[in-house]
């Protein structure tokens, strides 16, 4: 995790700058905070997804339930190794999860709900 040197200016900004919070369509579940009642209402992650896209699916179900998702400007450090870009097996799992997501009723309904961004694509 990268950290700035503790200069007077860096410390001033650290304690006085407001953290930006923005509304988004989905968040990565590597660091997710969700109200328990929402988790239970939506029955958590769809276990049909293996390793990939379960966070997108859950986020879209949150949105379809009429709730909002916010992303705070914070940093989380993960020191684990990720080899999925080098592994054909992980690539296949990723593609299978994407195909499952893109063909799901949740994705179809969410695409109709979410507003397109200016270039015509959806913000998914």
Q: Where do the PLM segments sit?
A:
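Acidic/His-rich active-site region of diverse nucleotide-sugar glycosyltransferases
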Residues: 1-42, 91-94
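Active-site-adjacent helix/loop segment of glycosyltransferases
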Residues: 59-124
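Catalytic donor-sugar/metal-binding loop of nucleotide-sugar-dependent glycosyltransferases
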Residues: 22-23, 30-32, 36-50, 56-77
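Residues at secondary-structure transition points
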Residues: 29, 53, 85-89
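Generic hydrophobic-segment detector
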Residues: 19-20, 49, 87-88
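Sequence-level detector for tyrosine residue identity
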Residues: 15, 49-52, 108, 122
């Amino acid at each position: 995790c990268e950290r700035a040197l503790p200069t007077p200016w860096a410390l001033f900004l650290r304690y006085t700058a407001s953290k930006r919070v923005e509304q988004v369509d989905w968040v990565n579940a590597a660091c997710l905070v969700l109200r328990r009642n929402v988790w239970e209402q939506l029955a958590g992650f769809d276990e049909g997804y293996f390793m990939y896209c379960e966070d997108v699916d859950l986020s879209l179900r949150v949105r379809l339930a009429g709730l909002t998702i916010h992303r705070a400007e914070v940093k989380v450090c993960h020191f684990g190794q990720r080899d999925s870009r080098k592994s054909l097996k992980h690539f296949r799992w990723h593609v299978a999860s994407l195909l499952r997501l893109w063909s799901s009723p949740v994705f179809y309904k969410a695409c109709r709900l979410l507003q397109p961004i200016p270039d015509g694509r959806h913000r998914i």
